[in-house]
UniProtKB/Swiss-Prot annotation:
It comes from Trichosurus caninus. The chain crosses the membrane at residues 33-53, 77-98, 113-133, 178-198, 226-246, 288-308, 320-340, 347-367. Binds 2 heme b groups non-covalently. The cytochrome bc1 complex contains 11 subunits: 3 respiratory subunits (MT-CYB, CYC1 and UQCRFS1), 2 core proteins (UQCRC1 and UQCRC2) and 6 low-molecular weight proteins (UQCRH/QCR6, UQCRB/QCR7, UQCRQ/QCR8, UQCR10/QCR9, UQCR11/QCR10 and a cleavage product of UQCRFS1). This cytochrome bc1 complex then forms a dimer. One of its GO terms (cellular component) is mitochondrial inner membrane. The keyword Metal-binding applies. Keywords: Electron transport, Heme, Iron, Membrane, Metal-binding, Mitochondrion, Mitochondrion inner membrane, Respiratory chain, Transmembrane, Transmembrane helix, Transport, Ubiquinone. Heme 1 (or BL or b562) is low-potential and absorbs at about 562 nm, and heme 2 (or BH or b566) is high-potential and absorbs at about 566 nm. It is a multi-pass membrane protein. This is Cytochrome b. Belongs to the cytochrome b family. The gene is MT-CYB. Heme b b562 binds at H83, H182. It comes from the Eukaryota.
Length: 381
């Protein structure tokens, strides 16, 4: 009798994806984040589903329904805090996953990379609409400020904003539709993840050396299942540490006050994972320019394959590119810090310098470093 794992139509797909998948023998812990992101997504969908059972998407009861979840629902506090901090873990893994892709040249698998960028945008949209749901001060004003950015679009901007709001301000209609979006988007993300994996398995995984690994492959199970399980233990440890000891460390104190359209918080800022983009948005005094820079800061990832000038795929043996990569990482950390600071000197100028540096590094310096490294590696005799 033939093995069911290799013959059954559904088991066969699972087998080719997680068990008998040929994987490079030298992929490091940086390749763990794909599976961690998958687990984060499952966890967010499950905790979100249980939250949705008790949440009411109405401006008069939304805030108190979240309080009710934390006070009266069995383990509601745990589900809510796992969901909120799970989003932070999701973005942490996402940023590390993208960083790995840039460092090791994974973006040269263009279809996989492009679907990945679409996934990033979808996850960001999901997180944004989700942040509005508790209907606290920062939820309300964050929604007002970010949706208002669309009014910078010439001619149709104002109409577009009112269309998204469902009225003349962020109100009941906005909250209801944002809840609908927040519920449907994770399932769209799941579908996109399957497409992402489909394209990845067309080519196989990249590896730290950037050299074609076809001559040296090992089965995914048991080697990488056990390795991914170790990564999962680490991630769950950090998540539980956050959730059980400092559940509100990454949230804004203003969001513990119910939304009040008559009282603006002193500093409107998004969650930490959007601060880098928010800093770029704020660093340009012009509204439309800021919105375009905000979009460009994410969409520039789509240009990564076009900006690759090196003869080598990975940065593993390219010290100049490595240096620029870590400068870019530090630059993003500076932008994240600036995004959380008030709009005053010296933060304004630091934000502007960091924003210019961000685009300069990706568009000019890193491609130039690739060309210079090619030149240095040419035989001189």
């Amino acid at each position: 009798m033939s093995n069911l794992r290799k013959t059954h139509p559904i088991m066969k797909i699972i087998n080719h994806t997680f068990i008998d998948l040929p994987a490079p023998s030298n992929i490091s812990a940086w390749w763990n984040f794909g599976s961690l992101l998958g687990i984060c997504l499952i966890m967010q969908i499950l905790t979100g589903l249980f939250l949705a059972m008790h949440y009411t998407a109405d401006t008069t009861t939304a805030f108190s329904s979240v309080a009710h979840i934390c006070r009266d629902v069995n383990y509601g506090w745990l589900i809510r805090n796992l969901h909120a901090n799970g989003a932070s873990m999701f973005f942490m893994c996402l940023f590390l996953h993208i960083g790995r892709g840039i460092y090791y040249g994974s973006y040269l698998y263009k279809e996989t990379w492009n679907i990945g960028v679409i996934l990033l945008l979808t996850v960001m949209a999901t997180a944004f609409v989700g942040y509005v749901l508790p209907w606290g001060q920062m939820s309300f004003w964050g929604a007002t400020v970010i949706t208002n950015l669309l009014s910078a679009i010439p001619y149709i901007g104002a109409t577009l904003v009112e269309w998204i709001w469902g009225g003349f301000s962020v109100d009941k209609a906005t909250l209801t539709r944002f809840f609908a979006f927040h519920f449907i988007l994770p399932f769209i993300i799941t579908a996109l993840v399957l497409v992402h994996l489909l394209f990845l398995h067309e080519t196989g995984s990249n590896n730290p050396s950037g050299i074609n690994p076809d001559s040296d492959k090992i089965p995914f199970h048991p080697y990488y299942t056990i390795k991914d399980a170790l990564g999962l233990m680490f991630m769950l440890f950090i998540l539980l540490l956050l959730t059980l000891f400092t559940p509100d460390m990454l949230s804004d104190p203003d969001n513990f006050s119910p939304a009040n359209p008559l009282n603006t918080p002193p500093h409107i800022k998004p969650e930490w994972y959007f601060l880098f983009a928010y800093a770029i948005l704020r660093s340009i005094p012009n509204k439309l320019g800021g919105v375009l820079a905000l979009l460009a800061s994410i969409l520039i990832l789509l240009a990564m394959p076009l900006l690759h000038t090196s003869n080598q795929r990975s940065m593993m043996f390219r010290p100049i590119s490595q240096t620029l990569f870590w400068i870019l990482t530090a630059n993003l950390l500076i932008l994240t810090w600036i995004g959380g600071q008030p709009v005053e000197e010296p933060y304004i100028i630091i934000g502007q310098v960091a924003s210019i540096s961000y685009f300069l590094l990706i568009i000019v310096l890193m491609p130039m470093a690739g060309l210079f490294e090619n030149f240095m590696l040419k035989p001189k005799w």
